[in-house]
């Protein structure tokens, strides 16, 4: 049986150089190859003209360049594009491109599904399947860059920012997320600024400490409630890592980080008459007073079967004003792509359909059982 080929999109620069050393090649050859991959989007070794023919043949015999494919895409009226990315085994994840006047952000998934079961999030309600590999994470950027056109073709960078805010909890997939972000930041990779790569977490505190020791990127933290009692319901991982512990971990990360410029972004979804009262705004302000942050209020994006409603503009405005009275910088996130279910909390991919099929199957089995009894 032939040996499985190495997918070069799985390798950060350290691993790529180790592979080339194993082949008896100098480190700069690995750097050249990475540049072909990520600056020019080349996947055919024969097109890598500054790499000699013998090495190209060695690479072709031992390695491959395989990224997940785009299955389909939908374009919103506001220009947002939601991509369904086929990661094999009949599974898909969703990746969202958000163009703005001064930037173009790609929202990337880290897992097929999510295990955290946040009650306001469509992805969290669909269950967890598996972690994505490095090539499946960076491959989302690579494929969308091909779709939009690399800088060599268009004259401008197609993606300026990456946010790890798609499907999944990134800190539960650190083994693949860290090398993937290394490739995003690497000068021979996607060459993004560390301030333009953001990881969002719901609070896996031990993994947050490991992240801070391994890499420096911007951090967004999903708080969503001003106290443990409510957060236990909205974000069930809070039962394991409560707010005091999470906030202490955030402060440790800030102390290690330059990317965050001394503060993180707090994400707070606005749920009608659940977490959006002025009393809760005062409570949130007091909770966050010792943690340097700006606060991003996110109008809830309903999904089929969701138990919550979106806060009214007037309630969001009152909540925001209370926080500003305490001196916080407050941003109300503009909802993008909600007409194609691409907004925050709406991503579910193929898992939604699979969950529906499983639920239908269980219901049918129960009906059969009742009939037999």
From Swiss-Prot:
GO BP annotations, alphabetical order: rRNA base methylation; tRNA methylation
Residue sites binding [4Fe-4S] cluster per the record: 114, 118, 121
Iron is among the record's keywords: yes
Residues that, per the record, bind S-adenosyl-L-methionine: 168-169, 200, 222-224, 301
Cofactor binding, note field: Binds 1 [4Fe-4S] cluster. The cluster is coordinated with 3 cysteines and an exchangeable S-adenosyl-L-methionine.
Catalytic site positions: 94, 344
Lineage top rank: taxon: Bacteria
MF GO annotations: 4 iron, 4 sulfur cluster binding; metal ion binding; rRNA (adenine(2503)-C2-)-methyltransferase activity; rRNA binding; tRNA (adenine(37)-C2)-methyltransferase activity; tRNA binding
GO CC aspect terms: cytoplasm
Main location: cytoplasm
A Pfam family hit: Radical_SAM
Coiled coil: none
Disulfide pattern: 107-344
Record function comment: Specifically methylates position 2 of adenine 2503 in 23S rRNA and position 2 of adenine 37 in tRNAs. m2A2503 modification seems to play a crucial role in the proofreading step occurring at the peptidyl transferase center and thus would serve to optimize ribosomal fidelity.
Family note: Belongs to the radical SAM superfamily. RlmN family.
Protein name listed in UniProt: Dual-specificity RNA methyltransferase RlmN
Organism whose genome encodes this protein: Shewanella baltica (strain OS155 / ATCC BAA-1091)
